[in-house]
Amino acid sequence: MHLSPQEKDKLLIVTAALLAERRLNRGLKLNHPEAVAWLSFLVLEGARDGKSVAELMQEGTTWLRQDQVMEGVPELVHEVQMEAVFPDGTKLVTLHDPIR
């Protein structure tokens, strides 16, 4: 299997996001890397599902609440930027203050 560096990065995000999802399902709070991976994964999947950049930017502020992350994490995550593949090409999606 030959993967580009970008594809390897996305695989790492997916792996970390699946771990984050399991921890959320067990009621555990996410740390900084887990929270960023989870948000990034949801952007990638939303783009794959056909959502627009605007939809993802709006929905992205509802995916994680402050009570789902460890203390201090919301203050560390001011924005999450992710390049995602849309039907009309690759676009940058930015989530501003996504943990509310």
From Swiss-Prot:
Its main location: cytoplasm. One of its GO terms (molecular function) is urease activity. InterPro entries: Urease_gamma, Urease_gamma/gamma-beta_su, Urease_gamma_sf, Urease_subunit. It is an enzyme of class 3 (hydrolase). Pathway: Nitrogen metabolism; urea degradation; CO(2) and NH(3) from urea (urease route): step 1/1. Its EC number is 3.5.1.5. One of its GO terms (biological process) is urea catabolic process. It is found in: Cytoplasm. Keywords: Cytoplasm, Hydrolase. GO terms for cellular component: cytoplasm. It comes from the Bacteria. It catalyses: urea + 2 H2O + H(+) = hydrogencarbonate + 2 NH4(+). HAMAP family: Urease_gamma. PANTHER family: UREASE. Belongs to the urease gamma subunit family. Heterotrimer of UreA (gamma), UreB (beta) and UreC (alpha) subunits. Three heterotrimers associate to form the active enzyme. This is Urease subunit gamma. It comes from Synechococcus sp. (strain CC9605). The gene is ureA.
